[in-house]
Amino acid sequence: YGPRPRECVDTMVDLTFTRPDNQVLVGNHDLACLGDIDLAEFNPAAEAAGRWTAHQLGMDHQEYLGSLPAMTIAEGYTLAHASPRSPVWEYVTSVPIATDNFGHFDTDACFIGHTHVAMFAALRPGASHAELGQLRDGDVLELSGARFLINPGSVGQPRDRDPRAAFSILDTVARTLTARRVEYDIAKTQRQMALANLPDVLMNRLSHGI
């Protein structure tokens, strides 16, 4: 969706080169830009952005993205782009969907993305269904007494009506997760998107976190 796809991929390459244990996953839009998913399946704005992005990526960017998994396990945590049941496409947005997904990973916690909404689902021992909760700036989630599905949100296009970049910090020793939100220069990003002739709807939504 953004105006600097090459720089984003280069940053991921640098992070994994300097720290080989860093984990990066491929998402549905990445796969669409590689031609593995038909861009015609996306809404018109996303399709237009995807076609523009595909033309910005060099062969080295494409090869890197094509080498990434959509799901992996690292340091005792499951990581999936969308969901453990369907790592590329499924949106975890409801109690039934979240509950069903706990049967598709074996670790105590699974980190997901795709919806661009910071949230968690907890399945406690003996419970028949998961509990859903939002992750707000400064929230600390203790990863004990339940199994968890956790979405840290999006740094580039949040969709929970908070336009600040969203991320979380995982403390693997204390087994806690701290949710964070930070301001960034949205207007600068929007100007760069305008110069690239990306769809207005994608620019405007950044101001509102939708």
Regions found by a protein language model. Name each.
Residues 1-3, 29-34, 85-87, 111-123, ...:
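Active-site environment of divalent metal-dependent phosphoester hydrolases
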Residues 1-62:
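Core catalytic region of metal-dependent phosphoesterases/phosphodiesterases
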Residues 35-37, 90, 121-124, 190-192:
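Short, well-ordered secondary-structure micro-motifs
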Residues 6-9, 93-99, 133:
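Charged helix-capping and loop-helix junction motifs
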Residues 22-23, 109-110, 147-149:
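Structural motif
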Residues 55-123, 210:
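His/acidic metal-ligating clusters that form di-metal
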Residues 12, 27, 65, 81, ...:
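Divalent metal-coordination and catalytic microenvironments
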Residues 125-210:
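Acidic, His/Gly-rich catalytic cores of divalent-metal-dependent hydrolytic chemistry
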